[in-house]
Amino acid sequence: MDNVSSAHEYIEHHLTFLTLGKGFWSINIDSMIMVWMVGLLFIGVFRYVAIRGTKGVPGRLQCFIEITFDFVNNLVKEIFKTEDKLIGPLALTIFVWVFLMNSIDLLPVDFVPALTRLFGVEHFRDLPSADVNVPVSMALGVFILIIGYTLKNKGIVGFIKELTTQPFEHPLLYPVNFLLELITLISKPISLGLRLFGNMYAGEMIFILIALMPWWMQWALSVPWALFHILIVFLQAFIFMVLTIVYLAMATEEH
């Protein structure tokens, strides 16, 4: 019974946020700190490479940054056919930012909480993408861009026409069309945010459960899971980026 109780307390401790306020208006400070930290790391590294970049033989870091840049740039050109100065930087920012946030999950479960405890902080959850507020907030930003791009390219009349005149062309079925299209539109940011949250939350939980096992089982299970989780970390960042580009491309195309 004591083991069950201690295991429950351990899990609860690792899933408790450092919050400011209570209820709906509470703010998870730990998530905000980690989001800003990885964001500043991203900006700092890319700025460093941009300033010190050479035209000769590039170093390893510069090669890695250039490969990442070309990978995202080619993907954007392939999906988003219209010339737009925002989409490329947006896609690169989303991919690298989400990837860095997800990569925090590869740190030992007790590493960051142990560090924060030295400063008197009892609860500190270090994986921002496992906080539903972060992925959903990012998805909400994408949703606003979708609406903005739709209105920019099709106008209010075109947007309303798109919501009401398909898939059924008969005027009596326009209300049905509107309901179906509205559900489709709203489901995009919801699925985008919850997909990232669900995968990272599940991965975090598995690491926590492995940490509760005897030390010899921890090594036997954590290493294979960490290696597999690297793929999840990359894929979730890739999927979030690709779907963002696809949704924005759809917002600029005529149906």
Curated annotation (Swiss-Prot):
Topology of the protein relative to the lipid bilayer? Multi-pass membrane protein
The GO terms describing molecular function are: proton-transporting ATP synthase activity, rotational mechanism
Q: Which GO terms describe its cellular component?
A: plasma membrane; proton-transporting ATP synthase complex
Gene Ontology biological-process annotations: proton motive force-driven plasma membrane ATP synthesis
What Pfam families does the database record attribute to this sequence? ATP-synt_A
Record key words, sorted? ATP synthesis, Cell inner membrane, Cell membrane, CF(0), Hydrogen ion transport, Ion transport, Membrane, Transmembrane, Transmembrane helix, Transport
Q: How does it assemble?
A: F-type ATPases have 2 components, CF(1) - the catalytic core - and CF(0) - the membrane proton channel. CF(1) has five subunits: alpha(3), beta(3), gamma(1), delta(1), epsilon(1). CF(0) has three main subunits: a(1), b(2) and c(9-12). The alpha and beta chains form an alternating ring which encloses part of the gamma chain. CF(1) is attached to CF(0) by a central stalk formed by the gamma and epsilon chains, while a peripheral stalk is formed by the delta and b chains.
Protein family (similarity comment): Belongs to the ATPase A chain family.
Protein name, UniProt field:
ATP synthase subunit a 2
Tell me the classification of the organism that encodes this protein: Bacteria, Pseudomonadati, Pseudomonadota, Gammaproteobacteria, Vibrionales
- Gene of origin? atpB2
